[in-house]
Amino acid sequence: MTASVTTSVTAHPTAPAPASQRPPADQDGADILTVARREVLDGGRGLDEAGVLAVLRLPDETLTDLLALAHEVRMRWCGPEVEVEGIVSLKTGGCPEDCHFCSQSGKFDSPVRSAWLDVPSLVDAARQTAATGATEFCIVAAVRGPDARLMAQVREGVAAIRAAVDINVACSLGMLTSEQVDELTAMGVHRYNHNLETARSHFPNVVTTHSWEERWETCEMVRAAGMELCCGAILGVGESLEQRAELATQLAALEPDEVPLNFLNPRPGTPFGDLPLVEPRDALRAIAAFRLAMPRTILRYSGGREITLGDLDVQGMLGGINAMIVGNYLTTLGRSAEADLKMLAELSMPIKSLQATL
C-alpha cells in the first residue's frame, strides 16, 4: 500500500481542475509516453504512481497519441477480444452503508426503495444476458455483507443459473467473512466483485461506515481462495489527480483479474448528487492511465460511461478498455446491448470470456 489514511474529511469535494488549469507534469508529454512505450508496451511492466500521475496531467494535444499507445498495450498484452457482462440486482436499496455516491444507501433521501428478486427472475435475467453473447453474469446485492438469508438465496440462484444457462456467474455481495468466501467458491462462483472505489487517502471523504482496509481484506481473501477478483473504481467523487494515480497503483498492487471503471453519475438525494461529471477528455486520460498501470488486466467499462462520454465511448475501446457491461446498471440506465454489440462488431473486437495474464 502506498499511502496512509488521511485524518481530515473534506465536507464538499471538488472535481480535478481541467487540463488547461493544471500544473505541468513532472515529465513532459513526450518523455512519459516514451517511458510508457519502453516499460509498458515493450516490457509489460505497469507505470508507477509518478508515471500514472504524469499521464493524468498530459495536455489535451497529446490525447490522441496517449490513447493510441494504451490501445497498443491492450492489444499486445490482452489481445483484441472483449469480455461482455450483464448484471442484475438481487437485493436493491436499503443498504446500511453511507457510500456518498450511491442511491441504494438507506441513509440518504433517494427515490430507490428496497426490493428483492426471486430465483426464477434471476435465471431469466441470466438467460437474457447470455442471449446477447455475454459470457459473464453478476448477481449484486446492496448490503454491507451477506447474512444467512442472502447467502441461501445466492446459493439457490447460482445453482439454478448454472443448471440452466451457459454463462459464468459472478457475485458482488459486499464484505465477506472467510467462511462466506469458501462457500461462494464451493458454489462455483467464477469471479467476485468488491471495489476499492477510491484511493486510500480519499476514502474517508467518500464512505464513513466502513474502512478502506476492510474492503482490501475481502479482496485478499477472495484471491487467496482461488476465485477471480474483480476490483475497481469510481472516478469523479472529489478525488484529486494525485489520488487517481494513487488508486491506480493501489489496484495494481492488489493484482485483480478485472478492474471495472465507473464514472460518477450524480444521484439525487445523495451527498454527491451535485458534483460535476468527469470531463470526457479527463475520463479518456484516466482510462489510458489505468491501462498503462495494469497492462495485463481486464479493464471494464462500467457505470456512468454513457453520461460521461456519450458517443466518445468508442475512443475508450480504442484507448485501453477490453470489457464492458451491457444493458442497464443497478439503478441507472445503460446503452442498449444492441448498440454496444454493433460497436464491437464495427471495431472487429470479438466477444470472449477473458482471464488476466498476471
Curated annotation (Swiss-Prot):
Coiled coil: none annotated. One of its GO terms (biological process) is biotin biosynthetic process. [4Fe-4S] cluster binds at residues 95, 99, 102. CDD domains: Radical_SAM (cd01335). Binds 1 [4Fe-4S] cluster. The cluster is coordinated with 3 cysteines and an exchangeable S-adenosyl-L-methionine. Binds 1 [2Fe-2S] cluster. The cluster is coordinated with 3 cysteines and 1 arginine. Residues 80-305 form the Radical SAM core domain. This is Biotin synthase 1. The lineage of its organism: Bacteria, Bacillati, Actinomycetota, Actinomycetes, Frankiales.
